[in-house]
Amino acid sequence: MSRYRGPSLKKIRRLGALPGLTNKRSKAENDFIKKLRSDKKSQYRIRLEEKQKLRFNYGLRERQLRKYFSIAIKTRGSTGKVLMQLLEMRLDNIIFRLGMASTIPAARQLVNHRHVLVNGRIVDIPSYRCKSRDIIMARDEQQSNTFINNCINYSTHNRMEAPNHLTLLHPFKGLVNQIIDSKWVGFKINELLVVEYYFRKT
């Protein structure tokens, strides 16, 4: 399944806020309509939609998300928490959470166009897994700084503060303090439902 490139509002109306996909917000539904919709959902659909939240928020293909789940199963610890750590420590997401890009797709574009350095070296792989003490910064070129500055200006009013595991040293440079704790994930998700979804598919 390919990466989603359709209307973002269509997805957030169905799944709720997806800050990695877009900083737009859908119009709030009244409580009665929300309850009516939730009452009609099967358990399978509830698990599916929670899985889709992950896919669309982080901009992943189904095959990519399934691969992360396979890694999480084989890793010591809670499968759901490990899965969230793997997704949150992707380079494109770190750039987004630092506020150097307005969305994860915008962050991915920065990486693909070789505007980003990790520990002084160009990294052009959005899925690169960041580690504790990694330093993320723009290349020392006017084009890179301008590109990131435009992203920062665009997202200033919607940008959240950097979570505890990250420090924005200045607009073009950030530090990974540590591996993320699950309580610092940037949007509402029940990762246990995602784990249940994949376990039931196997």
Curated annotation (Swiss-Prot):
Signal peptide: none annotated. One of its GO terms (molecular function) is structural constituent of ribosome. Pfam families: Ribosomal_S4 (PF00163), S4 (PF01479). GO terms for cellular component: plastid; small ribosomal subunit. Residues 89-152 form the S4 RNA-binding domain. Part of the 30S ribosomal subunit. Contacts protein S5. The interaction surface between S4 and S5 is involved in control of translational fidelity. This is Small ribosomal subunit protein uS4c. The lineage of its organism: Eukaryota, Viridiplantae, Streptophyta, Embryophyta, Tracheophyta.
